[in-house]
Amino acid sequence: MKFESLASSSTGNVYIVSDRDTRILLECGVSHKRLKELTGFSLSEFDACLVSHEHKDHSGCAAKLIADGTRVYMSQGTALALGLE
């Protein structure tokens, strides 16, 4: 298993947890364009994204990921705060 920290600050948080078969984003707190630049992957290559809470530096492009077909997991409260439920 591999853990990568690609962005970690109040301006955005993005981490990747992966193994040979699975690639998961932890947090998506940057723009969709920046997320593509940071990861170096097509976002369709991610199996899922986990968002811890609604602050933009953790959830910035959650709606875009969902629209693009990525499974994004979060609490019901976070989804409500982001207007996604």
Feature locations, PLM:
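Short, conserved SAM-binding/catalytic segment
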Residues: 85
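Conserved beta-strand hairpin/beta-sheet module of binuclear metal-dependent hydrolase folds
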Residues: 1-39
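Active-site metal-binding motif and surrounding structural segment of the metallo-beta-lactamase
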Residues: 31-78
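A short, active-site helix/loop in glycosyltransferases that binds the activated sugar's phosphate group
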Residues: 80-82
